[in-house]
Amino acid sequence: DLSHGTPMGEVLTILLFCGAAMLAVAAFERFRLRRFWSRRCTGAEWRRAFPTAPKAEIWTFLDLVLSAFAFSQSKRLCLSPNDQIMALYQALYPSLLRAGDAMELETFAISFQEHYGVDPLPVWREDITLGQLFSYATKGS
């Protein structure tokens, strides 16, 4: 019997509650990131902003961003050169959740430096855009 009050019933209740909480958090995350993920392909924006940059180079940069935030590569061309990296971070972590982040910005900075051989911190600002970071990363190319 799996009725309430038994150890098995209590475990099932806890598991159901945890599952419902996880679903609610995932739905809330999708809602907060919707302004990025609901876009059509931003490839033309990247090509206009960086007409001489090879597509593969732009994609590699975007993949660094997506990887640092643990987002799917299928979201690559949902990000615009005008997007601020902090806006992406703030959409993922509303002010109440920021204390428990997964070090996405630190991971991005390390990956950026490893891949491009330049430290992004000297140019980092609260309002820095992905396009500005890409330009800084590829200025010597």
Where are these regions (language model features)?
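Phosphopantetheine-dependent thiolation modules in NRPS/PKS and related acyl-activating systems
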Residues: 5, 9-114, 118-141
